[in-house]
Amino acid sequence: MRRIILSIMMGLIATIAIAQERTVENRPYTDLRPCHFGVMVGTHLQDLEFINAGPVTYTDENGAEVNSNVTIDQDRWDPGFTVGVLGEFRLSTHFQFRIAPAMYFGTRHLTFHNIMQDANEDGNVKQEDKKQELKTAYISSAFDIIFSAPRFNNHRPYIMAGINPMMNLSGNKSDYIQLKKTDIFLELGLGCDFYLPFFKLRPELKFMYGLMNIYDKDHVKNVKDKSMLPYTLAAKEAHSKMIALTFYFE
C-alpha cells in the first residue's frame, strides 16, 4: 500500500513539474496591442422559461365565453449556431473590454398541453397536446468585461461578464405565440486563451439569461382563427436562457 501511495505521489509531483516547465511563447506581445479584431463561430443551447396564465376565459367566433386551461413548455434545450465578429480593447494588464456583434440562429420546439373536461364522462379530464416550431434569428451586440489571469506559457485563463442586447428578426403571425423583438441578456462565463503560432484561439463557455419578459401579449390581436386563442393566451411571461460555446479567432 505504501508503495502504491508513494508511486501516486511521485506521479503527481512529476506531472506538476512538467506542467510548470517554461516553453517558448508564441506571439509574446499580442496582449500588448491597444485593440484588435477577430471572428467567432460557435454553438448554443436555448430554452424558454414560461410562467403560465392558468385557466382563462375568452370569446369564441360565436360570441360565447369559453373557459380554457392550456400550459406551454419547451421540454428540451434546442441547439443552434452562432457567427460574428469582435473588437477587443486593452484596459490594463488583466482587464479587456470586448464588443462582439453576432447572429444566433435556432429553432425552439414548444408543446401546448390543453387540459379539457370530457363532456361524455362527468369528472373525467383529458389532455390534448399541440406542437409548434418557433424559429429564431437574433442579431446581437455583446458588451463584455474580461478579467484574465497572468499568462503562463501559451495559455491564459479568464472569466467574463457582460450584457448582450438582442433583436429577434423572425416571427410568423400564424404561430400560436410570438416573442417580442428585443431582449437583453446577462452573460457570465469563462474561457482560456491559447496562443498559436499565427493567431490566438479562445474557447469560451458562457451562460446567458434574458432579463426581459419576451412573451408578446399583443399577438392575440392578430389571431384571426379563434380556435388558436386558448394557446395564444396560455402564458403571461417568458424568459429566454442560453448556454453558448464559442470559439474566437483573434
Model-predicted regions and their roles:
Residues 1-24, 247-250:
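Bacterial Sec-dependent N-terminal signal peptides
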Residues 20-80, 242, 248-250:
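Short glycine/proline- and aromatic-enriched beta-strand/turn motifs that initiate or cap beta-hairpins
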Residues 22, 26-36, 43-47, 86-171, ...:
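Gram-negative (and chloroplast) outer-membrane scaffold detector with strong preference
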Residues 33-37, 77-81, 135-141, 155, ...:
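Residues that define the transmembrane beta-barrel architecture of outer-membrane proteins
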Residues 51-74, 107-136, 169-179, 215-235:
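Flexible, solvent-exposed loop segments that connect beta-strands
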Residues 155-156, 170-177, 199-202:
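Short conserved catalytic/interaction loops centered on acidic-Pro-aromatic/His motifs
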Residues 182, 187-195, 200:
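Conserved C-terminal beta-signal and adjacent last beta-strands/turns
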Residues 197-250:
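Predominantly the C-terminal beta-signal and adjacent terminal strand-loop region
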